Each structure stands twice: as structure tokens, then as C-alpha cells.
């Protein structure tokens, strides 16, 4: 079970509206994150099917991971609706589901259970570092409620990473994955992390707010803002450390790999 409860632990009435209400980029970021997080039940179901050999993993996925991810979505949704109550969240979310659900199937899973655990580690690296950046951004805006909320989420994501790491190691005892295979999955997941779901979230907001066909150039502007945020607030060294951990490298190799991973992240726009 989640170690915090957004209904009790987040005081939405204490939000400093002046600091955030005019920030449309922040609105987009938090709304997109709420859409993706709140849809975690679909992933939990697919993952539980994939790991039906492992009742302990399934229990953790259903009783902890899924509940915590959905809580992230609910907590962010409430923040968005508190600050921007005129936004038809539900309507935009329904559009998001139309675009996003066809992508959520076990067909996109890795070929082995160990490699899929590894892919989940990369996803959790993405979320951990993203919420760490959001927390830092919220602090720079001097909005303590958002800083507190994103800190809670950040802690959960790091915890998810360590669970998936544990299961990755468990499966790797029998799968004996080589570094090349591991690196391939890392790079592949890094590519995916930077794209589709965020763009679909953006598209749904755009369509509902403008009542118009999606204009890709507005997404390019959003990405520019995202890059600006990353430059100031993204914890790159934490991301690199978490990304490289499954490679289990010695110190010399690790030093060699840092610029490779950093370079890959740059190319991918992370
Ligand atoms: Fe989450
Ligand atoms: Fe997570």
C-alpha cells in the first residue's frame, strides 16, 4: 500500500495560486502526467498476465505498484482541477484513451521476463528523474504544495525502480543476459520514453482546448519548453547512474560508458 495518501497528506487549499495559475506549460506537464499515471491499471493487468509464473511479483504489481501509480494520477488530477477548474479534464482524458489504449498491449513487451523487468527499470528511471525535475521546478516557483506532492511521487518512483531491479536480478540468474542485450533494451526504452505517450497527452489537451485538429507545431513549442526545463532542473547524473546500474560495470567501464549514455540521451532529446 502507498505510504502516503493524497487526500490526507496534500493540502490543496494551501496552493499558492498566484505562482502557478498563469503557467500554461506547467498546466500541460501536470495534465499529461495525470493522464498517463491514471491509466496504469491497463499496464498492471498486462504485466500481471506476463508474470503469471511469479505470484509474488503479481501481488506486488497489483497491491502496491498499480495503486501507487494510480494515486499519482489522481493526486495530479486534483492539483490540475484545483488550479485550472475550467479545464474539462474528463473530456480530454477520454480523447487521450482513444489515442493511447491501442498502444497498451503485451505485444510491445520484451521477449523475456528478465528483459521486460529491465525495460520497467528504464521507465521508472524516467519517472523518478522527471518528478525530481518537477520538484526542483516547483521549488523554483516557490509553490510548496506542488513541491511536496512531486516529492512524494518521486520517492515512490525510486522505490518502484528498486523493486523492478530486484526482479530483474532474479530472472537474470537463469536468463544470463549479456551486456549487449541489456544495452539494446536500455537504448530502445530510452527512445520510447521520450515520445508517444507524452505527445498523445499533449494532443488531447490541444484538441479539447482549441476545438481544432492537432497542430504539430504547437507540440514542437512544448518540446522546446521541456528542453529548457530539463537544462535547468533535470538530474542527469542520477539518470545516468540508474540507467547504467543493470549493466553491472566495474569502475573503469563505467567511466567509459558515461559519455556513451549521456550522448545517447542527448541524441534522443532527453
Ligand atoms: Fe507514477
Ligand atoms: Fe512508478
Positions of PLM-derived features:
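Non-heme di-metal
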Residues: 1-270
